[in-house]
Amino acid sequence: MSTNAIAKRYAKALVQLGSEAGTVDSFNTELDRFSALLTESRDLSAVFANPAYGIESKREVMKELVAKLQLSPMISNLLMLLLERGRISVLPEISQSYGAFADELSGVIRPTLSSGLPLEAGQIEEIRSALAKSTGKKVELKVEVDPSLIGGVVTKIGGKVFDGSVRTQLARIQDILQKG
């Protein structure tokens, strides 16, 4: 089974438990914090991945981290389970999948809006409103400036890309001229 499939199973189960307990958002925050710690600290990741360290040593390290980060018992149990099963390295993917499932549950989408030039607040709000109206969901828009676009905007929602950039329009014109 792929690590992505494994991550989705753990994430989905945790979202269901969080939904029942009303702790979806706090679980998301805790997963993100611990996942960031694993990603940023190569030494910590190396300890958990190294078979030379026994499971008891790894448990002690995990207990200290859980206490220091003040993680909930549910997240603590998940981390211990992942550690026992040798799957702690999958945590960043679990965290990412959890965030996606939590957003789906709460009716949130997180599109990325890239523009060739900085956009004004009014323009951003207009785009956010249009996306909310067309999707029927709450929109958490991430705005980026990409000078290579020359002008226009590119919006990415999940796996879909809506490209209204000048760069793409110029590329299309070039293709037409070369073929014609």
From Swiss-Prot:
Q: Which UniProt keywords apply?
A: ATP synthesis, Cell inner membrane, Cell membrane, CF(1), Hydrogen ion transport, Ion transport, Membrane, Transport
**Location(s), subcellular:** Cell inner membrane
Taken from the UniProt entry, a GO cellular component term is: proton-transporting ATP synthase complex
Q: Does the keyword Cell membrane apply?
A: yes
| UniProt key word NAD | no
Q: Name one Pfam family in it.
A: OSCP
Which GO molecular function annotation, any one, does this entry have? proton-transporting ATP synthase activity, rotational mechanism
Q: Note the topology in the membrane.
A: Peripheral membrane protein
Functional summary from the UniProt entry: F(1)F(0) ATP synthase produces ATP from ADP in the presence of a proton or sodium gradient. F-type ATPases consist of two structural domains, F(1) containing the extramembraneous catalytic core and F(0) containing the membrane proton channel, linked together by a central stalk and a peripheral stalk. During catalysis, ATP synthesis in the catalytic domain of F(1) is coupled via a rotary mechanism of the central stalk subunits to proton translocation.
Q: How does it assemble?
A: F-type ATPases have 2 components, F(1) - the catalytic core - and F(0) - the membrane proton channel. F(1) has five subunits: alpha(3), beta(3), gamma(1), delta(1), epsilon(1). F(0) has three main subunits: a(1), b(2) and c(10-14). The alpha and beta chains form an alternating ring which encloses part of the gamma chain. F(1) is attached to F(0) by a central stalk formed by the gamma and epsilon chains, while a peripheral stalk is formed by the delta and b chains.
The similarity comment for this entry is: Belongs to the ATPase delta chain family.
Q: What is this protein called?
A: ATP synthase subunit delta
